[in-house]
Every structure is written in C-alpha cells, then in structure tokens.
C-alpha cells in the first residue's frame, strides 16, 4: 500500500468550490434518504399491525433484521471501500438500498418485507459509514470538522421528514409508498453519484495509482481555477518534496501498537454515543409515563424536547473547528452526564421540559462530533473505512443490548438510577477520550495517518 502525501496537500489547499458542494450534496442527500427509510419503518409498523399483516413477533423480527443488516453492512462496507475504492463502495450500497427499498414496496407478505428490510439495513449500514468517511478525504483540513458536521445536520432531519410524509402518505395512500419514495430517491442518488462522485485521489494514491490520482486531481484543480478565476498557490517545499511511503494495509493493524490505541478510543467514543443516545431518546416517553404524566402529554413533551437535536447539530457545525477535538468531545460527555442526573430528579413538567431540551441539545452535539467528525478522521487512508466500519459494528452491538440494561435498571431501581449509571459511564468515557484520544482538528489526514 502506497501513500502519496503531495496529493493530500493539494486537496487541502483547494478553496471550497462547486466540486466540494456536489460531493456534499450527493452524500447528504443519500444520508437523508437513508435516515428516511430507517425511520419510516417505525411509522409503517403501526399500520401493518392494524391491518393484520404483522404482530409483535414479526415486528421484532422486522426491527432486528434492520439492526443485523446495519452490523453486517458496517463491517463489509469497510472492506469494500478500502480494497475497491470509495466511489465503488458508495455506489454499490446505494444500489443495494435502492433495489431493496423498491422491492419492499411490492412484497406479498411480511416475511418478504423482513428479508428486504435486512438488505436495506446492510446497504444503509455501509452507506452511512462510507459516506462520512469518504467525505473527510475531499474536504480541506481547515474546514473539515464544520462541513462534516453540516453533513450530519442534513442527515438528522430524516426523523421529522419521515414522520411528516408518513402522516399523509399512510393515511391517504399506502404504506408501500413510503418505501417506494425512499427507493426511487436512493436510485436517483445512485445515478447522480455516477456523474459527480469521483474516486478519492487520496485512495488512488494510497493504492499506488499515482497517475489516476494525478488525473482526477488535476481536473478538479483546473475546474476550480476556472470557476474562481485564480491560480492555486504553490505547495510548500516540504509538501512538494513529500516522498512515497509504503504501508501494508492489513485489517489486523487496527489491533497493533498505535492503531490499537485509536481503535479503543474510537470504540469508547461510540459506546458513549450509543448508550446515551438509546438511553435518553428511546426511554424518555416511558420515563414520563412512569413519572405520572399521561401518554398524550408525554408524546407532546418528547416532540418538544427533540427540537434540541437539529439545533444542537447546527451549533456544533458552527463551533466544532474552534476547539480541540478531545476537549470538545470530553466536555460534552461531562455536560450530558451532569444534565442527565439533574433531569432525572425533576418533578415539575416545565423543569422536565427545559432540562430535557438542553440535554438533547448537548447530546446531539456529541452525536455529530462522534459519528460525523471524529471517528472518520482517526484512521490512515488505507484503513479508514475498515477502521470506521469495525468500530461502528461494535457500536451497533452495544445499541442492541443497551435497552435491556436500561429496562432492568428502570424496573428495579427507577429512572434516577438509570441516569446515575449512565453518568458514571459517560464520565469514564470522557476520561479515556481526554487522556488517550489523538488531536485531529485542522490536521491533514496525512499527518493523522502517521503511525508511531
């Protein structure tokens, strides 16, 4: 495996232009539709139960099929992306999701729907990881955090989008239309990616395909020079004299030396994200009801509290490049841990609402930091997708078992204990991140790739 630092330096000196906006548009559109299809399942299941298509057992199988697909996709997508290219991995998984979602619109029974849901999950698990990880290789280091966060901001509108469209489509048409809309949209993204999603020059150079990387990058440079009416600045003497380095890209490097440290930090970061995300967002309505708030009011209060999610991601995009990554992530975890406990001891509805809103605001700032920004930055180019894929797969496993732990604590000890245990775990994760995390803010991917 070869790595060519000059290619990275030339990508980092580019001013933002239509080239970057097209890449951003294709990936963000794909992530939005992926989220739409994922959250549409929640809306569709209620309809399937009411019309006799499904029951609690089949609903569980439907949900588990998606989660298992996510797990498989996260692992396989990383290998495809590192061995065969970012563009090919992205487009293959777009096609899988598009065909599976379209097929789900025409299934004859629930068993076929569960099968297509698994295929959707496999493609979406890979697509999310490949999208975020690939994006980091195109965006200049000085604004990489901000634009990766914006990618997350667009993608996280999908719950509201699926809920809004689902209310109309399922009521007046059919649940099948939800999958058909998502499938057609994904296939449109697949078509557009064929025209505008180029192969990562960093990946080409890393594979020793220097001529291909040079051709792709020179074309981009010429487009930007014409668009901006400028001449790109020359590279520094260090950048222009960068040498080719040979690195073997075996998957097992993730568990050796410096890479093991990064792998463990990444797993810790995602464990913190998943246990907080699934504890807080999934169980908020239940905790409301257990606190004596009626169901209708709990649903309304949950909707109000979740407004903090897009606002948190929006603010994260504005400020994330102004603070060191380790400080930013660990501080957010400490804030969430403290707010979680304060939130759990509130008894008045207005206090629950205010503290819940603020907690969700900071939680989604952390979700943005972890999934969209920090994790994709941690890895050398030749391991980026496999590293991201593996730690995301571990995160999926944690997400599967977290609800059972929360349910046991909630049943035997109450909601305050749930948030106390969560707080202790988040504080431990913050400690690991602050001590062992590596700093990636405004650092070129080539510098981050250095393995000591």
Curated annotation (Swiss-Prot):
Gene Ontology cellular-component annotations: plasma membrane
Membrane-side (Cytoplasmic) residue stretches: 1-20, 81-91, 141-152, 199-265, 321-326, 377-388, 439-452
PROSITE patterns referenced in this protein's UniProt entry, alphabetically: MFS
GO MF term list: transmembrane transporter activity
Classification via Gene3D superfamilies: MFS general substrate transporter like domains (1.20.1250.20)
Name under which the protein is recorded: Inner membrane metabolite transport protein YdjE
Predominant cellular place of this UniProt entry's protein: membrane
